[in-house]
């Protein structure tokens, strides 16, 4: 399975002047945790890191340091995530038919999740890793008043990996660019063009590091995993 990792995270919310994926998390950069999990997954045979030119030297040095068994390629990203993934799709090895897209900021994804997602692509053409929503969700109007309360039993929180056939995702990206569609994840592109996307069970701990609080929570989860592994 081919894996693309968009890795152009901003450090703005951290008050940092560098990519948040290069910030330290329990002794190594945030990105390192996602790379190591993908490397340990039995199904992942190639990894493409999609980043910005200013981060290339640091990220390539990180890959060298980790000494991963899985081949890793660097791919230059675009101005927005959507353009970056499109660049990544066009840079896949010749003959690639299926692809997983995984945000580098979701550094707690496990090898088991990557393998489960890879297996899902053998039975469905497109999916999103997701977990059921636990909180009650409120739809709010512009003036701050509650407009609606959706039925929680039908709501899922989308994560990554998200999986697709390369042909269908490339086609949707090209159509999206022509129509100037702006989406927040790749599954939304397929949805916009009427293509079915299924749900694959994600992981409750598969959070996205966006704020300093997320980084602190991620550290606690990793420490718990290390403790559990040590006493097993």
Curated annotation (Swiss-Prot):
Catalytic reaction(s) noted: 2-C-methyl-D-erythritol 4-phosphate + CTP + H(+) = 4-CDP-2-C-methyl-D-erythritol + diphosphate
Domain of life, source organism: Bacteria
Gene3D superfamilies: Spore Coat Polysaccharide Biosynthesis Protein SpsA, Chain A (3.90.550.10)
Keyword Transcription: no
The protein's annotated pathway: Isoprenoid biosynthesis; isopentenyl diphosphate biosynthesis via DXP pathway; isopentenyl diphosphate from 1-deoxy-D-xylulose 5-phosphate: step 2/6
GO BP field: isopentenyl diphosphate biosynthetic process, methylerythritol 4-phosphate pathway
SUPFAM superfamilies: Nucleotide-diphospho-sugar transferases
InterPro entries attached to this UniProt entry: IspD, IspD/TarI, IspD/TarI_cytidylyltransf_bact, ISPD_synthase_CS, Nucleotide-diphossugar_trans
Keywords in alphabetical order: Isoprene biosynthesis, Nucleotidyltransferase, Transferase
Positions MEP for the nucleophilic attack (site feature) positions: 152, 208
UniProt-listed Pfam families: IspD
PROSITE patterns noted in UniProt: ISPD (PS01295)
Site (Transition state stabilizer): 13, 20
EC number per UniProt: 2.7.7.60
One annotated GO molecular function: 2-C-methyl-D-erythritol 4-phosphate cytidylyltransferase activity
Protein function: Catalyzes the formation of 4-diphosphocytidyl-2-C-methyl-D-erythritol from CTP and 2-C-methyl-D-erythritol 4-phosphate (MEP).
Family statement: Belongs to the IspD/TarI cytidylyltransferase family. IspD subfamily.
The protein, known as: 2-C-methyl-D-erythritol 4-phosphate cytidylyltransferase
Annotated gene: ispD
């Amino acid at each position: 399975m081919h894996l693309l990792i968009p890795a152009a995270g901003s450090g703005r919310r951290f008050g940092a002047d560098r990519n948040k994926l290069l910030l330290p998390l329990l002794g190594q950069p945030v990105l390192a945790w996602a790379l190591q999990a993908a490397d340990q997954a039995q199904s992942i045979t190639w990894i493409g890191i999609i980043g910005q030119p200013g981060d290339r030297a640091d990220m390539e040095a990180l890959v060298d340091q980790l000494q991963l068994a899985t081949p890793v390629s660097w791919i230059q990203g675009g101005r927005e995530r959507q353009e970056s993934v499109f660049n990544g799709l066009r840079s896949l090895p010749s003959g690639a038919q299926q692809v997983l897209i995984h945000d580098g900021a979701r550094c707690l994804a496990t090898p088991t999740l990557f393998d489960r997602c890879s297996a899902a692509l053998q039975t469905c053409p497109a999916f999103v890793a997701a977990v059921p929503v636990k909180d009650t969700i409120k739809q709010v109007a512009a003036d701050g008043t509650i407009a609606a309360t959706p039925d929680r039993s039908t709501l899922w929180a989308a994560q990554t990996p998200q999986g697709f056939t390369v042909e269908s995702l490339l086609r949707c990206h090209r159509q999206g660019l022509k129509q100037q569609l702006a989406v927040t994840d790749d599954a939304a592109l397929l949805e916009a063009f009427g293509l079915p996307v299924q749900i694959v069970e994600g992981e409750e701990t598969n959070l996205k590091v966006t704020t300093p609080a997320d980084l602190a929570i991620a550290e606690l989860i990793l420490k718990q995993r290390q403790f559990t592994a040590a006493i097993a």
